[in-house]
Amino acid sequence: LITVNGRSYRSRTVPVVGICLDGTDPSYLQAAAGVMPNLTAMAAKGSRGVARSVIPSFTNPNNIAMATGVPPSINGICGNYYYDQVTGTEVMMNDPKYLRCPTIFSAFVEAGVPVGVVTAKDKLRLLLGHGLNGICFSVEGVRKGAVPDSARRIVEKIGRPAPDIYDPEISVYCIEAGVRLLETEKIGLAYLTTTDFVQHKYKPGSPEANAFYARIDHFVGCLDQLGAIVAITADHGMNDKVNPDGSPKVQFLETLLVDAGFREARVILPITDPYVVHHGALGSYATVYLGDGNTGGARGFMEKIPGVELVLDRSEAAERFQLPADRIGNFVVLADRSTTLGRTPSWHDLSVVESGLRSHGGLHEQSVPFIFNRQLHPTYSSKLAAGEANNFDLFDFALNGVQD
């Protein structure tokens, strides 16, 4: 057994491939079932259910929870972006210095198991690859010519240029890279994580979404045919966040607080990342710093804002969502299914989402698929059926829960 972060994992005799299909609400796969014969067959012979994502339902916290097997309260990664109160600066949470524990991947490499990690988004590469002496690269990096020596054979075998970050094919390339990884290297454990451009732009069942999932299905089928244990989940779901006229539905929280007299209010939007075309930095989760202001009055004020669903103070949020208390504000605010939280109108470039906004971050994007191409042991299948699985249990299920 390989023990990391208080959880023990078996290494398996066949490759184990964990896949995060970024932004894939279960409804995408249901709507695309007719064009996903491989996934349908895998789930029929294996196991299928729905798991919970970490809140905030954003990319970094969920990918790192899956990579470490533990929630943000332990691994430290509670957003794509956070406010460092020590330095007084707002920073992207992409640097491994923010990680507070090792990954499953580095622990497996230390135990002598060869590991491969492929991410579409380069922003995840350093976090996922921390302490990993193995294959770890991003498709975004390949496009920019940054191909590590360990990945050259894989990239050559794919034999086509890496797509742009705003091209649906970048995620297809990522999953195909997993196939070529298994074909060219002796891999014990792999993790493939895509990007959610398609889900931000197209609804479940749309021709564009179904065409995308049909492409993904082809390479998922290849992984299955190679004899791997395949485990599929997502980092979060996705919902429309629009007014009746189709414009983005936003409450500019910092503006509202300052105008109401909470002069020192600073709103941090942990969805913030380099990919503003996806979401305009608008999601359904925010954390609020109030300085020395009247925190009691602020809570009552925010709870009355239309579209705000839940306001928790620091200790409540840390306990309920298993978050690191020192990396969130005085309050955590979650919006309802169709509302996003902004800072100030001038802080966002709304032109990138004027044709419509689909986003995530709140409680309504917490349901994610949990699919395995093998049967699960009864204790695991009953946990999944009861809705008690977290997406960060992915490798526990794949390594320990899958029947031989």
Predicted features, each with a name:
Residues L29-P72, G116:
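Short, structured active-site-proximal loop/turn typified by the sulfatase FGly-forming signature C/S-X-P-X-R
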Residues L21, S57-F58, Y82-D95, C101, ...:
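Secreted, luminal/periplasmic, and some membrane-associated catalytic domains
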Residues L1-S47:
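Active-site-proximal N-terminal segment of extracellular/periplasmic enzymes that hydrolyze or transfer
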Residues A335-V402:
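Low-complexity, glycine/alanine/valine/leucine- and proline-rich hydrophobic stretches
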Residues A67-K203, A209, H278, S284, ...:
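His/Asp/Glu-rich, glycine-adjacent segments
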Residues D22, M66, F108, G178, ...:
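A residue-level signal for conserved active-site and pocket-lining positions in enzyme catalytic cores
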Residues G18-C20, L189-T193, A231, V332, ...:
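Structural motif
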